[in-house]
Amino acid sequence: PWWADDLEMLSKTSVGGIMLAMVESVDHVTETAKRLPNVPIVALVETARGLERITEIASAKGTFRLAFGIGDFRRDTGFGDNPATLAYARSRFTIAAKAAHLPGAIDGPTIGSSSRKLSEATAVSIEFGMTGKICLTPEQCATVNEGLSPSLDEIAWAQEFFAEFERDGGEIRNGSDLPRIARANKILDLAKAYGIHPSMFGDDPDHVSAPSDTYHY
């Protein structure tokens, strides 16, 4: 009921982006975008109705990213919190975001202060191709960022791949080179975004196996 008033107030500020709650239709995003032009909108989908329209919501003008409102979604549907129970919903978020050329979807929050529980929940987000996770407190950010950032093995593989690629002449040799180049670039870009720099590793890392095609790629 306060949507219009909130947007009126926000239009007078230099807000860098908003998370729009209870998105259930394209109109929810487009009408918000009209009132806040050029402001990125994270569409928080929290109901069965919203999930059924998530492809259209992802493609709506103004949608910058999708986010999964797990708590309200479970209340709306009666689902439990087992990862297998929510697998279909999470998959829909990831596929819709990818199809609309959006950044990876943001998973919902984890309630509780246990670092182990939060780490395990973040691993589930990664398994379903999600590249962000809502935090309920500032204290959760470090654990979530650690879980979402590339592993040391992934970074070492990316560095080794490029070193070998250059030693072999730096030319595309077969159809597998392009996806591996893209994957290695993505790993190193993510490492930089999370403050992990190549200088933290040796110039000639030990040989490591290629990481599996998972959340980052």
Please provide the spans of the model-predicted regions:
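Expand to "…catalyze enediolate/carbanion chemistry for C-C bond making/breaking, isomerization
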Residues: 1-217
